[in-house]
Amino acid sequence: MYVATSKQMKAYDQALLNKGYKIEELVDKASDAILPHCRDYDKIVIVCGPGNNGADGLSLGIKLHLRARKIKLYCFGNPNKLSKANDYYIGQAQEIGVPITFMDDDDIQLFINDARKADVVIDAMFGFGLNSEVRGIAKTLVNEINNLYNVDIISIDIP
């Protein structure tokens, strides 16, 4: 396992982008890194934030869906403020029929019910770019995920 600060990770991402990589390529690399850790799970819930970490989760959801896993994607955040990569992968997921719920406060119980029935919940809410206190629906989701005792949890970037 490698450990890096958020500053180091931002610099690494920027160096790759400067070399000509597209953000979608970085997202695919991130989801490829998580994919082997999901091989033993069939029922998978992925909760995605509005940024590139959410895009990592969306990309992973697509790959798992194509491997015939039972995937449920939950996305939150202002639809007008999604990262470019997040918006791209939402479109890709919708195109192939991956079930996506665009959450608001009324969908929390639906998420909880699905999460409790899952083999694993994948947290793709926030990445190393998080620089503020978690609040609103995200805070509620973090608390609910922390209360899942009989379900495995995998966090992409930061738990």
Functional labels for PLM-detected ranges:
Residues 1-4, 41-159:
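Glycine-rich phosphate/dinucleotide-binding loop and adjoining beta-alpha-beta core of small-molecule
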Residues 1-42:
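Positively charged, low-complexity intrinsically disordered leader regions
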